[in-house]
Amino acid sequence: MLSERQAKILKVIVSEYIKTNQAVSSKRIQELLNIKVSSATIRNDSAALEEMNFLEKQHTSSGRVPSTKGYRYYVDHLMEFDDYNESLKENLKSILFQRGTKIENVLEQASQIISEMTKMTAIVTKQNLNSELMVKKIDLIPLSETMASVIFILSNGEMQNQLFNLKDISLSDLSISIKIFSDCLVDTPVKEIENNISLIRPNLETTVKNYDLILETFMSNILQTKESKKEIVGMKNMLENPEFNDTDKLRKVINIMENMSPFDWFDVSYSSNQKMIQISTKIGEEISEDLSDISIVETAIKTEQGSTMLTLVGPKRVDYSQANQLINLIVEIINGDDHKNE
């Protein structure tokens, strides 16, 4: 456990390094501390913090920078939040009112503002699958001698359309297949369809030619309802951080943004501050050993259609207080908590 003075020194170093991207010297710490303490004491405490792996010493400078452990302690114990900027709050509210109640549009607009302010890339990921979403109807509609359409209607009113080329599959076989699908899968939750296909396959094998093509096409279409829709906003803002002048680091962060599933990354055990909503803040090696220079701040927003994840990705040296507070503000506005408190 850190002493009160050590905690203050760590807080000063983290805050100053976030602002300047420069190692923080003992002299600078002394200037920033709001307590009277000698430079020798600061050097001793800084050395102790380094020994405990809260700080790292840069070879090119006499100053120190935060380690992942130092950032984590800062986020968990030292991070403070300013009063909300009223103009920002009103701006976000106006977006909400203009866009109605469609949360995905609200988040895409709000995420652009957050990205510009934090210099982090914002990712809005909508998880389409509602836990109660079911297949309600499957219809076959012949369009011509060579083409037919299969319509899947889901319990939320959403429709999926799949075209079949009748040169590859006969209309008769397609009709038989759709009847089998309807008999076995209507009123089945979408999330369970993959598991139920094994029950359908033997029947298709014995009654339908090219059953594997029909089955593969059917599954690829219906499973689209389970896929997450991802919108990446503000990549250029993140690139303003000098950390991403390194091509290798940039390649890694782009790869994670393109391939990550925020729903898998989200972990409430990394909650940033118990006074706020559940916001997961992962730093460096907490994400992966290969991503030691990256941070992820995110939260899950529940809707009637499922969940939407708001994720911020940036370098390890970001303003965690600002990122957490902005996410918290957006969720408050979306949930209506802001109006309750007025």
From Swiss-Prot:
Superkingdom of this protein's organism: Bacteria
Enumerate the InterPro entries for this protein: GAF-like_dom_sf (IPR029016), HrcA (IPR002571), HrcA_C (IPR021153), WH-like_DNA-bd_sf (IPR036388), WH_DNA-bd_sf (IPR036390), WHTH_HrcA_DNA-bd (IPR005104), WHTH_transcript_rep_HrcA_IDD (IPR023120)
What are the protein's GO molecular function terms?
A: DNA binding
Q: Which UniProt keywords apply?
A: Repressor, Stress response, Transcription, Transcription regulation
List this protein's GO terms for biological process. Answer: negative regulation of DNA-templated transcription
Return the PANTHER family for the record: HEAT-INDUCIBLE TRANSCRIPTION REPRESSOR HRCA
- This protein is called Heat-inducible transcription repressor HrcA
| Organism listed in the record | Mesoplasma florum (strain ATCC 33453 / NBRC 100688 / NCTC 11704 / L1) (Acholeplasma florum)
- In the record, what lineage is assigned to the organism producing the protein? Bacteria, Bacillati, Mycoplasmatota, Mollicutes, Entomoplasmatales
